[in-house]
Amino acid sequence: MLPAPAAPRWPPLLLLLLLLLPLARGAPARPAAGGQASELVVPTRLPGSAGELALHLSAFGKGFVLRLAPDDSFLAPEFKIERLGGSGRATGGERGLRGCFFSGTVNGEPESLAAVSLCRGLSGSFLLDGEEFTIQPQGAGGSLAQPHRLQRWGPAGARPLPRGPEWEVETGEGQRQERGDHQEDSEEESQEEEAEGASEPPPPLGATSRTKRFVSEARFVETLLVADASMAAFYGADLQNHILTLMSVAARIYKHPSIKNSINLMVVKVLIVEDEKWGPEVSDNGGLTLRNFCNWQRRFNQPSDRHPEHYDTAILLTRQNFCGQEGLCDTLGVADIGTICDPNKSCSVIEDEGLQAAHTLAHELGHVLSMPHDDSKPCTRLFGPMGKHHVMAPLFVHLNQTLPWSPCSAMYLTELLDGGHGDCLLDAPAAALPLPTGLPGRMALYQLDQQCRQIFGPDFRHCPNTSAQDVCAQLWCHTDGAEPLCHTKNGSLPWADGTPCGPGHLCSEGSCLPEEEVERPKPVADGGWAPWGPWGECSRTCGGGVQFSHRECKDPEPQNGGRYCLGRRAKYQSCHTEECPPDGKSFREQQCEKYNAYNYTDMDGNLLQWVPKYAGVSPRDRCKLFCRARGRSEFKVFEAKVIDGTLCGPETLAICVRGQCVKAGCDHVVDSPRKLDKCGVCGGKGNSCRKVSGSLTPTNYGYNDIVTIPAGATNIDVKQRSHPGVQNDGNYLALKTADGQYLLNGNLAISAIEQDILVKGTILKYSGSIATLERLQSFRPLPEPLTVQLLTVPGEVFPPKVKYTFFVPNDVDFSMQSSKERATTNIIQPLLHAQWVLGDWSECSSTCGAGWQRRTVECRDPSGQASATCNKALKPEDAKPCESQLCPL
């Protein structure tokens, strides 16, 4: 665990923070909260010695002389702001910035300190006689001769220090269509557009190799910000400041404790596209623009997560208007869901509309972090209606500042991180661009007329006759045309925080408040864990369930950007570990059977019977409920998580807990060291059984008995090795019950692919006939006797290579002689005529909606060669329609 950085003494910390300031021109280096007095001043240049710059300020009844020298020592080598110009090559913008920064003293006092930027006016801060002062330009130009606001903050240290990253470390969504244009007498109209490949997202869960589970850890979302040519043309020299301000607003939203995690947005690189031919292809098709941008941004990312320029997600900002269904052009952003650690898909596209784009950015980044819309079926099923005032509301109306994140958003994010799908966020960046921390409405970039131009276009400005109730709460804008109607958007379009709204008053969260109240220092409070809650309900009534206890980060709750709690947020223990009464069904099988009553039918209208599917399931998906139609290859994922306490697989004792495989013993206790011995006895010493092994002697054509394995046998392993260079040597394993029913490769129908064989709750795993080592395995006690056979097809002679082993309880009467005697009575005669030989059905060609399944149907003669003498009228079908789950609209 990396320790949190110790707090250094004031002077070096102030120097570092204030030197970072000019990247966000006009923003104070520390939160603008609590200024005591301010005056407008015009800096004047004084003669200075060689290599020194002297500036004079007059305010508060006295003069200030700043003697400054160049100082860019705080800029890390990794610092990157790049531009794509006419050459198509990225050129660094930091070289010019390095000449912006100066530090020095005030009025010759050795204990004073000044740190400022001289690019685009004078921005920065200084300390003198125990008081702190900040200065920033009030105009849009870059001259020193323009008015600047000098603000006095009282004793140094009276304002809260900015919160840096927490270094302490303890793992196709739809487009967002939030706003529609309105005239003042129009009704609010909006529709939600689904992007390409959109679907209702399942909770992002799966098994993981991480050892830490249900732990709150600091996460760092390393971000590439890209502004296209339309942004560069619209904002000009203010572009960098604008996009960093958007990110600053979004970062504050992600610091709110309602997100239930420690999320830090970090900008590692800004890329400004000055020539559109070198940028991503942007059009009014939001989905297509996203695909183009995702492909384009990959060239700038470093593959190693440890590289200082590596980023976890890329965001494109554009002035392009996106149009969707029925020609509606009110889509504001688009992103794929749950792609945060996928370098090919972790990206989003944002339509810039001034400061409002910060909320769109936060929303689309939420999709990338796996959050669905608040009105999606999974959210409403779990939490009910959640209103329209959270970040992930499908339509942006007004953000609930006290609870910006819905419980559903917090849950999906937590499951993404606890499931190990956000491990790329665990590393803190080596260097990140500082974000503005002041009130944006204080800057010339966001004066009222500028806010109107950014949202509606260059010909708009603020309506002068705004009603008293709309001051700060609703931005109305108009043009100077023949009919100067006032326009607005959404149910709520508040003025930028910090916008002057009257003498001595500023806007704050849609209200006009006294300036001293808006800028009053807000104490920063780190969060603390509340006591552990009671143990919850056990997930099972027998066989080893799991119960949870949780604790919340609300003692105290983080306030004003304070750190969210780090450490374990949930703990679990085993419960009801007694064995279940034997019923011949596994717990996973019972979960699949629940869907037998649903309207899933075959071509003849018969209800399908569902059994667990293990074969072909990736290790990370073992805790999803995969079920296969009995006797068919069709399968479905019915649940994103099996019930806690379900075995991860037939060959392991590990159990699923919240979608993750965790270690457990044969006594059904989590983290227990107890294991099954070779006899299948929990904690046994392996002395209650004996080993049986053997091999097959030369056989006749047809089905030949190898061995009949008695009930109670464990650790069964039957192997048939193909001859080198021969894919089909004419020998295949088969399996049948005591009453003669075939479970595997019977009636000359060979299973080429891996499959599971379910026998009264016990699974036998079959490798498939195409495997070089054809294998049949089972690890748990066999519930009934089974006969293993070898099918030998006439043709080129390849002697079989079959070996088998298993363990039989000492009290079971079994001898190899009796097995061999039985084997001699079950020899099948050679095939006498050509027959149709069937392969297994393929998977459905479509993951949703209608598709097709295919299989091989071949006519083979008694020698196994292709033949044309089979009865074509009796040829089985080789294709059939299949239907997976309905495709989302």
Curated annotation (Swiss-Prot):
Residues 1-26 form the signal peptide. Residues 173-183 have a biased composition (Basic and acidic residues). Coiled coil: none annotated. Glycans are attached at N344, N400, N465, N490, N599. Pfam families: ADAMTS_CR_2 (PF17771), ADAMTS_CR_3 (PF19236), ADAMTS_spacer1 (PF05986), Pep_M12B_propep (PF01562), Reprolysin (PF01421), TSP1_ADAMTS (PF19030), TSP_1 (PF00090). One of its GO terms (cellular component) is extracellular matrix. Binds 1 zinc ion per subunit. Residues 138-210 are annotated as: Disordered. The active site is at E364. Residues 184-197 have a biased composition (Acidic residues). InterPro entries: ADAM_Cys-rich, ADAMTS/ADAMTS-like, ADAMTS_ADAMTS-like, ADAMTS_CR_2, ADAMTS_CR_3, ADAMTS_spacer1, MetalloPept_cat_dom_sf, Pept_M12B_ADAM-TS8. Disulfide bonds join C294-C347, C323-C329, C341-C424, C379-C408, C452-C477, C463-C486, C472-C507, C501-C512, C538-C575, C542-C580, C553-C565. This is A disintegrin and metalloproteinase with thrombospondin motifs 8. The gene is ADAMTS8.
